């Protein structure tokens, strides 16, 4: 996944407004509303592991999977710096292979949208289901076609904070896809 080679070192700076604490709270409250015990939890497409670390700090038995070695390197370094013992694995979403079962899987920040073929989405759901306990819970989010057509569309966004300056340019493509070009300075 060459597109993530330089992206990993800027990712956390770019995602400062992602409200990870609120996402973590929401996930835990959602599970609670279903009377669900998080149990062993997979953070699928964990990126730099920010949510993974927050879940761990809240007492969740969590591990992370991502395909980008660069993202995983950032995740492992951050977990180590925070004194957290978290397993991170390099695997593709659509072909995860685990040694046991999970009770919960979370996949946030529109990571499912990075799968551009419906077959890969189906494979991902099948693989998660294969390793999920019978009473398991899969929590994920996606961008909608509406967002792709009306928000991202043919727009350019500029993000600037203390750690990154990014120009985000969207180009609509066929089949409700959007090509995204990111330039970092």
Question: Could you say what each language-model-derived stretch is?
Answer:
Residues 1-45:
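Conserved class I S-adenosyl-L-methionine
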Residues 42, 49-95:
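Class I SAM-dependent methyltransferase SAM/SAH-binding core
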Residues 139-185:
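SAM-dependent methyltransferase
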């Amino acid at each position: 996944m060459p597109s993530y080679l330089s992206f990993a070192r800027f990712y956390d700076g770019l995602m400062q407004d992602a409200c990870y604490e609120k996402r973590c709270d929401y996930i835990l409250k959602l599970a609670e509303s279903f009377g669900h015990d998080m149990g062993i939890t997979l953070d699928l497409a964990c990126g730099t592991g920010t949510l993974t670390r927050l879940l761990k700090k809240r007492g969740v038995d969590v591990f992370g999977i991502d395909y980008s070695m660069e993202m995983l390197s950032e995740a492992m370094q951050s977990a180590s710096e925070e004194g957290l013992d978290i397993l991170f694995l390099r695997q593709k979403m659509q072909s995860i292979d685990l040694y046991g079962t999970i009770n919960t899987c979370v996949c946030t920040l529109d990571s499912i949208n990075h799968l551009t073929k419906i077959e890969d989405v189906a494979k991902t759901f099948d693989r998660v289901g294969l390793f999920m306990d019978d009473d398991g819970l899969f929590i994920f989010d996606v961008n909608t076609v509406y967002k792709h057509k009306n928000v991202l569309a043919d727009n350019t966004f500029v993000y600037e904070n203390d750690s990154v300056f990014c120009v985000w340019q969207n180009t609509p493509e066929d089949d409700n896809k959007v090509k995204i070009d990111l330039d970092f300075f």
